[in-house]
Amino acid sequence: MDFLTLAKQRCTTRGFTGRRIEKEDLDKILEAGRVAPSACNRQPQQIIVVEKPENIKKVEKAYKTFGSTCVLIVCQNKSDPLIRPFDGKCSGDLDIGIICDHMMLAARELNIGSVMVGLFDPAIVRKEFGIPEHIEPTALLLLG
């Protein structure tokens, strides 16, 4: 499928079937995120894959998961951020958006639904998953 067709077919999914994501498909989605461009190729992302039902329940304390069986907690490493000198803007949020977009498009190509969530409580996610202070939970990517 050509890119524009793929981009047009990608849509937000807020109701998942409960179908498990195959390891091979998950690996392809994660690889798409790994090769996504980032400012100065800093690759600030650290991704936590959540599949066990008891861990999905931990995510649900911060935001609903709509029946997703796989949640990617997309974090950025803040220990060495790339800061724009003119106004102090960190490139990490933009980078994470690009990385998530790559993974959502890869999921769509595999006929897997997705939704990127930014409106969640990162403090809850940090606590539930023991995420250190220099790693910032930035987005949730729900798959199914």
Regions found by a protein language model. Give the residues of each.
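A glycine-rich helix N-cap at a beta->alpha junction
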Residues: 67-72, 130-144
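Glycine/small-residue-rich phosphate/adenosyl-binding loop
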Residues: 25-99
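A generic local secondary-structure boundary/capping motif
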Residues: 60-63, 127-131
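Residue-level "edge-of-site" marker
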Residues: 46, 120-122, 139
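Specificity-determining recognition surfaces
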Residues: 1-25, 140-144
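Short catalytic-loop micro-motif centered on adjacent basic/acidic residues
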Residues: 15-16, 46, 113-116
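Short secondary-structure junction motifs
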Residues: 42-45, 112, 138
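Small-aliphatic-rich amphipathic alpha-helix that forms the alpha element of a beta-alpha
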Residues: 33, 72, 87-128
